[in-house]
Amino acid sequence: MKILITGITGRIGTNVAKHFINLGHDVTGFSWSKDQKIEKMKNFGCKIITGDLENFDDVNKAVKGNEVVFHMGAAFQSGGPFSPNQYFDINVKGTFNILEASLNNNNLKHLVVTSTDGTIPKYPKKRLEYPIAEFDLPQNATDWYGYS
């Protein structure tokens, strides 16, 4: 299967890529050109396309022809500094670009869009008694990464 992973150099993206490469799939990563981890990913046996999530043409070219898209790419705390507008353009408009490009891709079978734990409180005042389920905690972002 042809798989595209945005955010391939991130903690989760790297592990998703390794998993599908080990299963013999054709994995391509879409990454920001300034990402210093690109070369590391090439060593795992995947192709890397550089571009910007907020640029629809870049996103459309990356999505085209893939059967599966995992969208995990985002401007994040340690990648910046980013302004509030940059967080919005990259994270929100970038996600819309992924959705729009996916609609234009007749080969696409699956689109997986992820979020972040930056939208929930990481250290509640009271200890957690049970594992966290999807709708257990209110959204409680504390920075522009979480907001976007």
Model regions: which residues?
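Residues at the starts of beta-strands that form the adenosine-phosphate
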Residues: 2, 26-27, 109-110
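N-terminal Rossmann NAD(P)H-binding glycine-rich loop of SDR-like oxidoreductase domains
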Residues: 3-25
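SDR active-site strand-loop-helix element
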Residues: 6, 30, 69-75, 111-117
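Conserved glycine-rich Rossmann-like NAD(P)H-binding loop of the short-chain dehydrogenase/reductase
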Residues: 25-34
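NAD(P)H-binding glycine-rich loop region in Rossmannoid oxidoreductase-like domains
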Residues: 36, 46-90
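Conserved Rossmann-fold NAD(P)-dependent oxidoreductase catalytic core, especially the SDR/UDP-sugar
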Residues: 96-142
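Active-site helix of classical SDR
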Residues: 144-148
